Swiss-Prot record:
Residues 362-373, 374-381 dip into the membrane without crossing it. It comes from Rattus norvegicus (Rat). This is Delayed-rectifier potassium channel regulatory subunit KCNS2. Its main location: membrane. The keyword Cell membrane applies. The transmembrane segment S4 functions as a voltage-sensor and is characterized by a series of positively charged amino acids at every third position. Channel opening and closing is effected by a conformation change that affects the position and orientation of the voltage-sensor paddle formed by S3 and S4 within the membrane. A transmembrane electric field that is positive inside would push the positively charged S4 segment outwards, thereby opening the pore, while a field that is negative inside would pull the S4 segment inwards and close the pore.
């Protein structure tokens, strides 16, 4: 077809002109005015071409005699395209992959904006699901790899006892002390450690009550001797626990690089520093101000509660979540900072002349902080109508700001909790019997690595299987 005849078809014979469309063998006659309703689409631009070269840039082939345009595309989807030209609404082909459908409509020059409301929600939901599944799969893969590395390091540490004096005995003690749930001995030791930690915390809390305080010779409140006995027993237990772990550690240099061991150290150091300070103050009254240091150090006993992280999967998962969620936590703090800055200035502008509690912007920062976090102490409240409306908006904004990043943090917590449970299950399945030493010409580390990799793969598959699949597997075996 010449340039003039095609242009005449689209300009002078718009009402009656027809063109033939062949999409993978699916043929249809279409009126030109139907296609020109959407001139930005591929078929609409086809009618506005001025040369054969321009036509062939938009279609795969063109028959001058039949005036037929050929497209080597999916013929099953083209009826949906035709329906769009007739009604202006695009429906989604459910049988086709959502990304293939997206590529097809992009080829035809149809924007996703034209997808009808009945299909829009499911279409965009199906596009998001693969991204979420990809993130979950990547997280599971990273979890398995990280867990495998940790267990491999665990096996490597255990193998260091081979050839050492009392190596097998020290290894069993190390497993019992460092891995709660590994054996009956480790469970008993774990329960005793938890009871001592809780007893120490409860004693510290009860000691703050006036009914349990005994005045000294100067009338100052002092500790009950019974509580001091409990405190000294707790310190003795914590010291024994730390020294025992250090004595049976496979690598003394790496011992204090472990965060849990640092927590154990910090739980007893304040007591010994306080003991030294008290001795110095008693021997030299001029250094009485050092007694304040001892009082501050005594408050650090509350951090002993962190020792429970060694015995709690949830606490360790929480620590890992906070470690790897710094972006989400930073995002949460950023949202709160922006909201606090905005609402504090608004409250200051409205309430500065009516309310002494909101007479300065720093004072308004405090009010905006407790309002956005929905704490609401009630110590400072706006008095004007405009101030109350501002407070309502501040509270609603705080709810939205806190909820958005919390979902991401919760997903990561679930991920790390599942990983930690798999890690503990794998460690409880470890076997350090003499059977390993009976295998000659096999590298112990490689054997451990192969065994752990198989174990982690099976645990990951089990976590992905549904209950029905698990029951079916059990019935087959």
């Amino acid at each position: 077809m010449t340039r003039q005849s095609l242009w005449d078809l689209s300009e002078t014979d718009v009402e009656d002109g027809e063109i033939r469309i062949n999409v993978g063998g699916f043929k249809r006659r279409l009126r030109s005015h139907t296609l020109l309703r959407f001139p930005e689409t591929r078929l609409g631009r086809l009618l506005l071409c001025h040369s054969r070269e321009a036509i062939l840039e938009l279609c795969d082939d063109y028959d001058d005699v039949q005036r037929e345009f050929y497209f080597d595309r999916n013929p099953e989807l083209f009826p949906y395209v035709l329906h769009f030209y007739h009604t202006g609404k695009l429906h989604v082909m459910a049988e086709l992959c959502v990304f293939s459908f997206s590529q097809e409509i992009e080829y035809w020059g149809i924007n996703e904006f034209f997808i009808d409301s009945c299909c829009s929600y499911s279409y965009h939901g199906r596009k998001v699901e693969p991204e979420q599944e990809k993130w979950d799969e990547q997280s599971d893969q990273e979890s398995t790899t990280s867990s495998f590395d940790e267990i491999l390091a665990f096996y490597n540490d255990a193998s260091k006892f081979d050839g050492q004096p009392l190596g097998n005995f020290r290894r069993q003690l190390w497993l019992a002390l460092d891995n709660p749930g590994y054996s009956v001995l480790s469970r008993v030791f774990s329960v005793l450690s938890i009871l001592v930690v809780l007893g120490s915390i409860i004693t510290m809390c009860l000691n703050s009550l006036p009914d349990f305080q005994i005045p000294d010779s100067q009338g100052n409140p002092g500790e009950d001797p019974r509580f001091e006995i409990v405190e000294h027993f707790g310190i003795a237990w914590f010291t024994f626990e730390l020294v025992a772990r250090f004595a049976v550690a496979p690598d003394f240099l790496k011992f204090f690089k472990n965060a849990l061991n640092l927590i154990d150290l910090m739980s007893i150091v304040p007591f010994y520093i306080t003991l030294v300070v008290n001795l110095v103050v008693e021997s030299s009254p001029t250094l009485a101000n050092l007694g304040r240091v001892a009082q501050v150090l005594r408050l650090m006993r509350i951090f002993r509660i962190l020792k429970l992280a060694r015995h709690s999967t949830g606490l360790r998962s929480l620590g890992a979540t906070l470690k790897y969620s710094y972006k989400e936590v930073g995002l949460l703090l950023l949202y709160l900072s922006v909201g606090i800055s905005i609402f504090s200035v608004v409250a200051y502008t409205i309430e500065k002349e009516e309310n002494e509690g909101l007479a300065t912007i720093p004072a308004c920062w405090w009010w905006a902080t407790v309002s956005m976090t929905t704490v609401g102490y009630g110590d400072v409240v706006p008095g004007t109508t405009a101030g109350k409306l501002t407070a309502s908006a501040c509270i609603l904004a705080g709810i939205l700001v806190v909820v958005l990043p919390i979902t991401l943090i919760f997903n990561k917590f679930s991920h790390f909790y599942r990983r930690q449970k798999q890690l503990e299950s794998a460690m409880r399945s470890c076997d350090f019997g003499d059977g390993m030493k009976e295998v000659p010409s096999v590298n112990l580390r490689d054997y451990y690595a192969h065994k752990v990799k198989s174990l982690m793969a099976s645990l990951t598959n089990m976590s992905r299987s549904s209950p029905s699949e698990l029951s079916l597997d059990d019935s087959l075996h």
